[in-house]
Amino acid sequence: MKRVSILQKLENAGVIAVVRGKTKEEALKASQAIVAGGMRGIELTFTVPQATEVIQELVALYQENPDVVIGAGTVLDATTARLAIVAGAEYIVSPSFDEETAKICNLYQVPYLPGCMTITEMKEALKSGADIIKLFPGSVYGPSVISHLKRHCLS
């Protein structure tokens, strides 16, 4: 049930802001400005120094606002995924599919959004329980790719 409610929050958020920063403080300030500006989805990347602490602080800051959804991005392995989940991340985003990360996310009932470039990667991610596929890198694809993939490859 936890996974379903998080997926609903992601859908309701509509747009997810990817937050990067050179410092913990910069990432916190940017995240707060994003929420103050009306957005509800935050993906805090693990390129931010002390990313787990930032996630913990954001989760605590917005615990009274059930519409805000905080996730972790640029998660490269299962160990980092677990650190993010323990810190309070509600979803995990990675630039590539990793089966061990999928297993950790499934264990904790946390949505996993791997980045995939090929149809083979997408199928493996879906078979491993990925909830949403992130086309990565996005600049490679045109607007028609999603309908084409759904119609011919992933149905």
Residue ranges and their predicted role:
Residues 1-87, 107, 127:
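Conserved N-terminal beta1-alpha1 strand-loop-helix module at the mouth
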Residues 1-2, 117, 141-144:
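Short, conserved clusters of charged catalytic residues that mark active-site
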Residues 20-22, 70-78, 94-97, 114-119, ...:
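Glycine-rich beta-to-alpha transition loops that act as phosphate-gripper elements at the mouths
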Residues 31, 55, 81, 102, ...:
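Generic structural signal for well-ordered alpha-helices
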Residues 79-121, 125:
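Hydrophobic, well-structured mid-protein blocks that either form specific transmembrane helices
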Residues 98-100, 126-127, 131-155:
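Active-site/ligand-binding-proximal alpha/beta "capping" segment
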